[in-house]
Amino acid sequence: MLIILMYLIFSGAWPVALVNGHPITFSEFGRNYNIAYHFYQSELKINNKDTSVLDSKDGIAELNRAVLDSTIENEIINEELNKILKPDDLNSIIDEKISKVDLNSDNFQKGAELLYGLSLNDFKQFVLVPKAKEQIMQGRLFSENRQLGDWLKEKKSQSRVVIFIPGLAWDGGGVVKK
């Protein structure tokens, strides 16, 4: 038991939240936090704004809240897409969407690194794939005359979410600061 606990701690595999029984791990949350932090830091620098706001108590709390809420939304979208599409079909559609992006452009690679702090492969995996899934879901909903925002609001209210990060809670519609 101790060995398992040690593995979970050192690998980042312990859950920070559960969404309909599916864990969001500390490593997944931490990765998403770092991507968002780097992006906002880059945006603030580009606009000659003070980046210290990101490191303030309120800045950290808000970024934690926003990143966890976004990660939960991604999980809800994943869950729905896995219900309506076979894995191979979903991957084919994702690949088709991503193939429309010129990933080999020097400017694209530099932008991914400067704005997100990610290599091209990581940018594809952690930014483009979730965005493609969101677009796929949006397309499915459009055919039903529904909007993604409305659908997400409905699904979030129906989801069973448990949050284990101190200072954050689930209010039935999103992540809020306590």
Go through the PLM ranges and name each one.
Residues 1-9:
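Single-pass alpha-helical transmembrane signal-anchor segments
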Residues 8-120:
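N-terminal targeting/tethering segments
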Residues 14, 107-111, 124-178:
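A C-terminal, polar beta->alpha supersecondary segment
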